[in-house]
Amino acid sequence: MKRFLNLIVYILTIHVSALLIAGLFRLVLFISSYHQLTSEALSDKTLPMLAFVHGVWFDNVIGCYILLLPLVVAVVCGVCNYYGKALFRFFTIFFSVFYGLVYLISASDIPYFAYFFKHINSSIFEWFGYAGTTAGMILGESAYYLSIGLFLLFLAGFVVWLIYLARYFHHRSLTISAPFPYWKRGGAVLIGACLIGLCIFGIRGRTGYNPIKVSAAYFCQDAFLNQLGVSPTFNLLTSVMDDMRPENKYLHLMDEQEAITKAQALLNRPGDANVSPLAVYRHAAKADSVQQRRPNVVLIMMESMSAKFMKHFGQSETLTPFLDSLYTRSISFRNFYSAGIHTNHGLYATLYSFPAMMKRNLMKGSVIPRYSGLPTVLKENGYYNLFFMTHEGQYDNMNAFFRTNGYDEVFSQEDYPADKVVNSFGVQDDFLYDYAIPVLNQRAATGQPFFATLLSISNHPPYVIPPFFHPKTSEPEMQIVEYADWALRQFFEEARKQPWFDNTIFVLEGDHGKLVGDAECELPESYNHIPLMIYSSRIQPEEKTAFGGQVDIQPTILGLLNIDYLQNNFGVDLLKEERPCMFYTADNMVVGRNDTLLYLYNYETQQELTYDIGNGKLNAVPMDDSFLPLKEYSFSMLQSAEFLVKHGKTLNSIP
């Protein structure tokens, strides 16, 4: 047993040593990019320390991947009572090769980060097709010599250390002469199993619902420190895995240039050669300002809130008395549709005015994309932005994505008491709303306008109805809607007591819908038909019947606020413009609809489904020219969005 424990100590010593060297690379990155630190980070020395702690966390994940096979080999050799020189030679070569790769990536990341301000990712493989040019670039730039030298120095030092450790621990194993009966071999198996289990847990990285993602490293408002904690190797591997996902393959609906030309005409966008083909400057009409003091904005995204749950849209049960009453007191929209059928689609489209791209989660990835949108424009105009979610911050990469794209603070399950967590999606709606009120009071007290986004969750399985709430219906799917509506009422009643209420615009929408009633076609309307209400005590109520979608919320709200900005997205101001139709997606389905026609296109099977809408009911009809405007409208918007994302033209400024 002593020889086995000697072997385990040897392997763990290598693991710790490797993490220390990875930390040295991080220290070099920190020093080389020190000038990127904000004044807040410079004044608070604990922030860099926390970034390094996150770095150890991420480095350990990669280390555990490497450690897993040696642990298995160690257990097998321990059971067989083999501790020969060949075993230690194997470990020396194995760790030298794999950590050599890790250190090569870390060294390469230093100049890469300095140039791109992001960690090395799968895009580097595009350079492999130009091997000569790439080699010339690396060898011809003297600034890269430091990274090359550090790599060679640290790797050489690590290999020498491995050789020393192998000799030392092998010699120790020879000096240990103890019998190794079968019961002790069983003990070795037990210890080894525990260590392997811990190693697998280390690979997962955390105890929460989701394994560790890049988002876990984001903890403050300093963009550099948020990225400092991410392991370059972790970032590279996960970005490669992201690229391999089928849903991330490039979308081909029509010719790119044709799509852009059509989108420019349909949206009346002249484009800006320095920004994007769809960029346009929006100049506010100052005389139409809602009020002298810039209003706060509270956006509430209601989980799975299909319009079909509301009496106003034909629901027979009284499920949403508060929303139905608010609908008549707001600027409300009768024909409003979600961009997709998942929460990430709704957030992405609502906040940044880009359409959902089929199944793809455009927020989720190790390489955090940058977008201009409602949060960034408001931030540029003096707003303080807050995001409140019920679940873990790294779910759908939300923490990292939103901190990168305009939000100052993100509140998530990690901030709430553990006893308030009711399921894998965190806390319930009423707790989220109660938690937000004092936070918003603190922000309002500063005199700075705020933009707060609250993402509810209760209307998502598994449904958890609080014991204190007594619904009137009998089915859980309906009871939870009653509860969600009740929680909203409680939030508004509490918010109405606050001094900031009258100077706040409230925007309420479903993040997407769900199946309500029977399916009338391949894609039931209830999945995407959602309510949108814009409420303020100083806004005249009105119902809009023109078509609109989540991509339109940003320009509509900025129009209400009378803010000048450069628009580079797919939204229209629904208070000043009208769409002839609306487009949206649902996983593999592209949809275009107007008052009389419905066009569905299955991207995977390339099947077209066409319906006539007569008296609110669908009648299947053959495809003909009358559906072409819907097809061209939908395809051109989606293909143009794919072009802008592919080429990084998602900001409202010159890159």
What name fits each language-model region?
Residues 30, 86, 111-113, 165, ...:
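Charged, low-complexity, helix-prone segments enriched in Lys/Glu/Asp/Gln
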Residues 55, 59, 137, 164, ...:
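Residues that form generic nucleotide/phosphate-binding pockets
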